[in-house]
Regions:
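Positively charged, low-complexity terminal tracts
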Residues: 1-127
Length: 127
């Protein structure tokens, strides 16, 4: 497993854990249900680089189904949903206050997430 800690300009931290089949986003504390992190190019590049390594046929593309939309994911361990949206940064809702997990990407959700981030970079909304 690969793990990297990223810090935004407000000193908030995200822990990215990469394993054989998914990419997880964590915080340092379990009690944070809502969490915001400033999106930056370093995070984007790391996520895309790792996605290409985990999923050999990784191709960013628009969400074309509910399963491809990264807005919501189901966490089997807590039997609850977590949420992610891009609005003035990344806004996470953890599935449970008993876990540090904020979000877990599968291949298709990561493809649509990276596609949306690339669109923002193209419009120069992210620096």
């Amino acid at each position: 497993m690969i793990e990297r800690v990223l810090t935004d300009e407000h000193k908030r931290k995200l822990i990215v854990r990469v394993n054989r089949s998914n990419i997880q986003i964590h915080t340092e504390r379990k009690d944070l249900l809502d969490y915001q992190f400033d999106l930056n190019v370093e995070l984007f590049k790391f996520l895309k680089e790792q996605a290409v390594k985990v999923w050999k046929t990784f191709t960013p593309k628009a969400a074309d189904s509910f399963g491809a939309d990264y807005w919501e994911f189901y966490d089997r361990n807590t039997d609850n949903n977590g949420y992610l949206e891009i609005r003035n940064g990344l806004k996470f809702q953890s599935p449970n206050d008993e876990t540090t997990l904020l979000y877990q990407f599968n291949k298709r959700r990561m493809e649509s997430f990276i596609y949306d981030i690339e669109s923002l970079i193209h419009r120069e909304a992210i620096k």
